[in-house]
């Protein structure tokens, strides 16, 4: 992070996937996913009280920002809670919104955060399926994917997403096989600019010839 007005440092490298406030761990004791408190928060327990004290003196409000389902630490610790592509690969940097453990964790975390830190506003980032294009850190892509390829690689086929699809009458296995087939074809042929533009214009209608995927 660039902290241009900081008297101590101009660039700050944060810990990954940790909480920068004093979590009430009792709220999480019966949950599978557990938060980890940042070293900064442990070393500076008076940070938030001092911040609110100083901002109140100056008539300022305090807003916060937290990243929700984009947590590689949690993904590595609980890989089954992640988005899984059509090949069954875990996308470690993105927890799946359909996963009940993920939902319980996020609801508890946000409730605890808003209780412990009385912010005037809170921005929630990545409360969604992030997509393949977001990727991780310093990826090497020697091919260059089309918009269609990126979309197909972004569809989650974890057990919970497939169960929800089946509950809606969708043949999730057939949809997964359709993604396999389309990605294999795209890797063997040159996907033209015109076809890519047609995908962006038609959106879901592009898959009308793949009933399970279109559903």
Question: Language-model segments: what does each one mean?
Answer:
Residues 1, 62-66, 122-124:
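Hydrophobic faces of well-ordered beta-strands that scaffold small-molecule active sites
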Residues 145-213:
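Extended, charge-rich helix/loop segments that form flexible
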Residues 1-43:
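Aromatic-lined carbohydrate-binding/catalytic grooves of carbohydrate-active enzymes
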Residues 63-117, 134, 141-167:
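Active-site-adjacent "subsite" loops/lids of carbohydrate-active enzymes
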Residues 56-62, 118-120:
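Short, well-ordered coil/turn segments that N-cap beta-strands
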Residues 8-25, 75-86, 137-139:
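Short, flexible, mixed-charge acidic loops at enzyme active sites
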Residues 48-53, 110-114:
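Generic structural signal for well-ordered alpha-helices
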């Amino acid at each position: 992070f660039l902290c241009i007005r900081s008297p101590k440092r101009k660039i700050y490298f944060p810990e990954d996937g940790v909480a920068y406030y004093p979590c009430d761990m009792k709220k999480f004791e019966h949950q599978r996913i557990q938060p980890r408190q940042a070293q900064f928060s442990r070393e500076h327990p008076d940070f938030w009280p001092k911040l609110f004290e100083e901002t109140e003196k100056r008539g300022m409000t305090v807003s916060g920002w937290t990243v929700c389902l984009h947590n590689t630490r949690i993904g590595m610790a609980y890989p089954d809670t992640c988005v899984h592509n059509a090949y069954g690969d875990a996308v470690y940097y993105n927890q799946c919104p359909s996963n009940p453990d993920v939902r319980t964790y996020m609801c508890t975390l946000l409730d605890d955060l808003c209780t412990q830190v009385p912010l005037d506003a809170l921005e929630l980032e990545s409360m969604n399926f992030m997509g393949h294009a977001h990727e991780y850190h310093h990826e090497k892509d020697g091919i260059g994917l089309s918009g269609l390829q990126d979309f197909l690689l972004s569809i989650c086929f974890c057990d919970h997403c497939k169960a929800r699809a089946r509950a809606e009458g969708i043949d999730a296995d057939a949809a997964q096989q359709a993604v396999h087939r389309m990605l294999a074809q795209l890797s063997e042929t040159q996907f033209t600019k015109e076809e890519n533009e047609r995908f962006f214009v038609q959106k879901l209608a592009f898959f009308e010839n793949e009933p399970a995927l279109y559903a």
